Amino acid sequence: MAQTDQTSPTRVPAEQAAAPALRRGVGRDAVVGGICGTVVVLMVGASYAAVPFYNWFCRATGFNGTTQVATSAPTSAPLARRIAVRFDTNVAGGLPWKFEAEKTEIEVAIGEVVTVYYTVTNQSARTTMAQAAYNVTPLTSGVYFQKINCFCFTEQTMAPGETREMPVVFYVDPAITADHENDSLKTITLSYTFYPVREAPKPVAAGEPDKPRGNL
């Protein structure tokens, strides 16, 4: 008579049975973590890229009253139509500068190249650095306000107590006369605000005697 196999089935320890599931869970966590890390890096990169892109977009379109940068003067003669240009000056809090336009308002012919001057004084006892942000109002005129030269293109470093005269060369593009949205425009206001950039580097001390080294 054949004997029945009474051998009990082999039991796998619980730790071994759980190991594959645990490894799968760890793998999923690693993938999710990697995806999240990549998203964070992309978001940070996008935030930095957005600043220069926004500045380029404003310059290209005149959006938000941003003026344009001209490489040369217009080739045609100025038009008979004239327009007033007002100059608004501001200094951000914490920047010890005095900033004024030599004239608060002038009248120019459309297409006429004009040079105006601003005076800036560093009223502190330390060297400071700043750069001017700018726009024009009404905002629709920004695309037609062309600057050939401006102190706002670069950072400005002022020594303690220094006063400097800063020119701006500009013209109002004759193309504004074809924009019927500006048919009734009588005045453009050019606004500047100086913002501190960072602490200027301290000059290396000159003429200081060498400190003694070791025992005499």
From Swiss-Prot:
Its main location: membrane. This is Cytochrome c oxidase assembly protein CtaG. Pfam families: CtaG_Cox11. SUPFAM superfamilies: Ctag/Cox11. Exerts its effect at some terminal stage of cytochrome c oxidase synthesis, probably by being involved in the insertion of the copper B into subunit I. Keywords: Cell inner membrane, Cell membrane, Copper, Membrane, Signal-anchor, Transmembrane, Transmembrane helix. The chain crosses the membrane at residues 28-50.
